[in-house]
Amino acid sequence: MRTITKIGLIIICTYNVTVAQSQQVAIELTMVFDIPYIGPINRIEKITFGPNMRHSIENSKSERFYARLFVNKSKGKIIDINSHNFWKYDIEDKEYWVVPFEKALYKQDTTETKKEDSGKKRSSWSTTIGDDDNTLEGVSRVENYDVILLGKQSKKWVTTFTSANGRRLVLEEWSVPELPQLRLADSLNRALELELGRPDSVITPLGRGFSNMMLTIENIPHELEPIPGEIIKAVIKSYGDDDDEPNFSMKLEITKLISEALELRHFLVPNNYKKVTK
């Protein structure tokens, strides 16, 4: 019986690998940031995942003139571990350049430095929730069924983190039942990141959700269960003490999710782009 079980597991694993190698998944992620003094920033990111390959295209636009000078960008990035190629390109200028593949690899020796730098750059709402000087007074959640997303009935979850100084972090998240396409994209992305040397513990799963990640922090006491399914839409709002309007907001949503047969041309720089040196 054990031999039969082992053979069955081998067959299943082989099938999953074969499917992943012959498929690609395209995701479109829309993001809107509303930042004080800068205003709304709209960003659309299209990512195509393949076996040990990833092609991301980013378009960012700002509504305010002075912010447009720095934010408005259309660019792409392709990583292909199979051929050890790393390209970046500018969509508006129709130019591309080769990046040394070593720059795509995860550098373990800079982890501590990155942690320190990220801690300095993070917003106050992400650094003070649950800190010793600003203890968390409570975590609450309400839920109800909501709109159809990606053809699935969604469920809306509103999780509120309230700190001792009156600040609130409100996470609105919409979940749907498990999506095979998103699971495949997550599997392909995880395999690529592992090949690049990134530890499994720091790879963020696709569709996991912000509140699920925050509730794993040790100094945040709660009795909430993780949100089940795939979280494909989220609105994050940060409020100051007694503020009715958020001082920061961010909206993210997976608007397209397509699984199709692998086409290698989707992981190449457009042939009408000019090669430059940077």
Give the label of every model feature segment:
Residues 2-10:
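Sec-dependent signal peptide recognition
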Residues 6, 15-16, 145, 173:
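Generic hydrophobic/packing signal
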Residues 23-278:
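Extended soluble regions of mature proteins
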Residues 10-20:
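Hydrophobic h-region of N-terminal signal peptides that target proteins for export
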